[in-house]
């Protein structure tokens, strides 16, 4: 079965064209995952404070089949499969009126915060057997790994400083904020003459973006299929994020 969380969408979650922003969709999904941990008996704060461990997101792919709007009531669901490696695979969907209108797949690793090392996921059963649900998953249900080649034609479009409102207790940008940051550099999403929305979004998290860091943001031109590539790099020139966004007309 899937763990379920019912929500009513806030007006403040929507963009210039009255569609829910991708960052809010990711937030709905990840808050539902957090609630599953609470329901299973070990909130993420306790996992960190009592066991010195934290989940770190490696990659996430989201498909938004239809736009969401203010005050709609939806059901957000999440599930994961038991793992025999270092990787946790977690899945999500959002249901409106009995119809699945968004889906996502994500990969996570468990980190020992003191040792700064990965922990095998199958070494622990923190959640008393309640964490894993026997839900079928398609063989290809894995997040798309975004890898932008060195020969990709990207143009520098601006800088973004990581500030107070971006970070969580890990002191780096919370991963639910990345879609907003990426979309802030897509002028297409603010074109009143040609309204559009994000249909798909794939994020590969390569290096954390810490409080106070200034990221350089580069992007490609939109191709014929509506795809745009985005890369962020820190002051040392290290790549922090690579993303692919697909837009469609409204």
Could you say what each language-model-derived stretch is?
Residues 1-57, 105, 112-197:
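Hot-dog-fold acyl-thioester-processing enzymes
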Residues 2-5, 63-143, 205, 209-214, ...:
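HotDog/MaoC-like acyl-thioester-processing domains
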Residues 53-67, 196-208:
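Small beta-barrel nucleic-acid-binding modules, principally OB-folds
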